[in-house]
Amino acid sequence: PIAGSMVLAAILLKLGGYGIIRMMQALPTTKTDMFLPFIVLALWGATLANLTCLQQTDLKSLIAYSSISHMGLVVATIIIQTPWGLSGAMALMIAHGFTSSALFCLANTTYERTHTRILILTRGFHNILPMATTWWLLANLMNIAIPPTMNFTGELLITSALFNWCPTTIIMLGLSMLITASYSLHMFLSTQMGPTPTNNQTEPTHSREHLLMVLHLTPLMMISLKPELII
C-alpha cells in the first residue's frame, strides 16, 4: 500500500532520527574518536544504499533505498554532536520527509496507469501527462538537493559539519552526492522519456493527485524561504 510507504518514509524513519538525537544528548560526554567507527559505518552505509539505488529496476524500491541513504548522512552528522550538524540533520530529515513522500505518491500515480513498477515499462509519460512530468522533475531536483531548497541547506550544513570534524569524510560525502544525482536523473529519464507505450489506456491526471503534490512541495518551499523555523 502506497500510504504505508509514505508514512514510513516521511514520518517513522525521521522519528528514528529524532530518537537518536535525544539519545545522544542523554549519553555522557565522551571523546569523539570513540564514535569514529559508527560515523564510518553510517557514511559507508549511505554510499552502499546509493549504489543499490543505481541497480534497482523497481521504482518503489529505488525511492525506499534513497530514503535509507539520506538517513545514513543524518546519523553520521548526529553522532558528532555539533550545532551545525544537528541543524543540518533536522533540516534534511524534514526536507527529505516531504520529498520521499512526494516521490512515493508519484510512483503510485504511475503504477495506477501502467500496473507495473518496472522502470523500463513505465516510460514515455512526458507526451501524455506533461503536468505529472513537471511534478516528477521538481521532486527529483529536490531529491538531488539543488539550491535554494531545504534539502540543499541540510546537506550543506551536514557537509560543513563533517568536513570540519574530519576532512577525509568529504570523499564519501562527495561520492554519495554524485551517485544521488545519477540515480535521480536515471529515475526521471526512465519514467518520463522514451517512446510512449501503445498498449496502455492512460487516464489523465486527477485534481486529487495535483493537490497531493502541491501539499507536499508547498510546505517545503515555504520552509526553504524561512529556515529558522526548524534550524
UniProtKB/Swiss-Prot annotation:
It is found in: Mitochondrion membrane. Core subunit of the mitochondrial membrane respiratory chain NADH dehydrogenase (Complex I) that is believed to belong to the minimal assembly required for catalysis. Complex I functions in the transfer of electrons from NADH to the respiratory chain. The immediate electron acceptor for the enzyme is believed to be ubiquinone. It is an enzyme of class 7 (translocase). The keyword Transmembrane applies. The chain crosses the membrane at residues 1-21, 34-54, 62-84, 89-111, 128-148, 169-189. This is NADH-ubiquinone oxidoreductase chain 4. InterPro entries: NADH_UbQ_OxRdtase (IPR003918), ND/Mrp_TM (IPR001750). GO terms for cellular component: mitochondrial membrane. GO terms for biological process: ATP synthesis coupled electron transport; electron transport coupled proton transport. Its EC number is 7.1.1.2. It catalyses: a ubiquinone + NADH + 5 H(+)(in) = a ubiquinol + NAD(+) + 4 H(+)(out). It is a multi-pass membrane protein. It holds the Pfam family Proton_antipo_M. It comes from the Eukaryota. Keywords: Electron transport, Membrane, Mitochondrion, NAD, Respiratory chain, Translocase, Transmembrane, Transmembrane helix, Transport, Ubiquinone. Belongs to the complex I subunit 4 family. GO terms for molecular function: NADH dehydrogenase (ubiquinone) activity; ubiquinone binding.
